[in-house]
Amino acid sequence: MRYWSIRDEDVIDLVKRRYNVTISADQIAKARGFEFRISWKKAIETARAIRFLTIKQAEDYMEKVKDLKAPIPIKEFTRKQAHHNVPWDGWPVAKWPVKVADSFLQVLRNLESNASYRGLNIDNTVIVHASASRGMRIRNYMPRALGRATPWFQDTVNIELVAVELPAELVPKKFSWARVLKAIK
């Protein structure tokens, strides 16, 4: 059995500390995606970038990343990474992970469906928890000369998103790069 990395009580406590609002377990929607064949490092950075956005803002952002119109800021895995001209100030390391954005879009659409099924207002639903963890390792071997073989393993990634319906005055109205950079710092 697979367990969530965050419990409902922890989500309620997180919302209480961040937004100073008391919510119930009925205002929480969750979605998971298992074993996507994507980069684990890029998935962590993408999860960090979409946290504290609404579901619609996160979907629009992932669509822009897929179309190579908006980059994902890279915070942790910056060694030997290119520095680009980016639409924000003071953070030059960025990437355009298309496969990761496509995988996150699948989970975001599932989260939107789960939230509407639970009766939550999609416009007021904010992602409060986004995580990417390593999944199963797919073992492959590349045949070499003289009967040898080289391991050619492939890692997979599990994606987990939790969203909460907040009061309308606490919901971010529009997408801003400053909020994305503040969330990843």
UniProtKB/Swiss-Prot annotation:
Gene3D superfamilies: Ribosomal protein L22/L17. GO terms for molecular function: rRNA binding; structural constituent of ribosome. InterPro entries: Ribosomal_uL22, Ribosomal_uL22_euk/arc, Ribosomal_uL22_sf. GO terms for biological process: cytoplasmic translation. HAMAP family: Ribosomal_uL22_A. This protein binds specifically to 23S rRNA. It makes multiple contacts with different domains of the 23S rRNA in the assembled 50S subunit and ribosome. Part of the 50S ribosomal subunit. This is Large ribosomal subunit protein uL22. The lineage of its organism: Archaea, Thermoproteota, Thermoprotei, Thermoproteales, Thermoproteaceae.
